[in-house]
UniProtKB/Swiss-Prot annotation:
The keyword Disulfide bond applies. Keywords: Cleavage on pair of basic residues, Disulfide bond, Ion channel impairing toxin, Neurotoxin, Secreted, Signal, Toxin, Voltage-gated sodium channel impairing toxin. Binds to site 3 of voltage-gated sodium channels and inhibits the inactivation process. Is highly active on DmNav1/TipE (drosophila) and is only extremely weakly active on rat Nav1.4-beta-1/SCN4A-SCN1B, and on human Nav1.5-beta-1/SCN5A-beta-1. This reveals high specificity for arthropod over mammalian channels. In vivo, when released into the medium, this recombinant toxin induces impaired swimming, paralysis and death of the crustacean A.nauplii within several hours. Also causes paralysis of cherry shrimps immediately after injection at very low doses. Residues 1-20 form the signal peptide. The lineage of its organism: Eukaryota, Metazoa, Cnidaria, Anthozoa, Hexacorallia. This is N.vectensis toxin 1 4. It is found in: Secreted. Pfam families: Toxin_4. SUPFAM superfamilies: Defensin-like. It comes from the Eukaryota. Changing residue 35 to L: In Nv3-1 and Nv3-3. Expressed in ectodermal glands and in clumps outside of the extodermal layer. Is not expressed in nematocytes. In adult female tissues, shows similar expression levels in mesenteries (gametes-producing tissue), tentacles, pharynx and physa. GO terms for cellular component: extracellular region. Belongs to the sea anemone sodium channel inhibitory toxin family. Type II subfamily. It comes from Nematostella vectensis (Starlet sea anemone).
Length: 85
């Protein structure tokens, strides 16, 4: 009887996994919009030395900058980079 219950549970899991819908892929424009809204603004080297008057044109990315973005801060950090497009 226990093996019958195990078979039923396994079949139910198989049906649940097989019928799961895949999420639609986002277009490049949607990805760019979401990338630009993600993270914390940061000051690039081109924004000037004064952080209070800087326009904060960069965005902090954990790890490294994604494709299409470039590092805009001159110092090196292992944890995060200040990047802009």
């Amino acid at each position: 009887m226990a093996s019958f219950k195990i078979v039923i549970v396994c079949l139910a899991l198989l049906v649940a996994v097989a019928s799961a819908r895949r999420r639609d892929m986002m277009s490049d424009d949607e990805l760019d919009y979401h990338y630009s809204k993600r993270g914390i603004p940061c000051a690039c080297d081109s924004d000037g030395p004064d952080i209070r008057s800087a326009s904060l044109s960069g965005i902090v990315w954990m790890g490294s900058c994604p494709s299409g973005w470039k590092k805009c801060k001159s110092y090196y950090s292992i944890v995060a980079d200040c990047c802009n497009q």
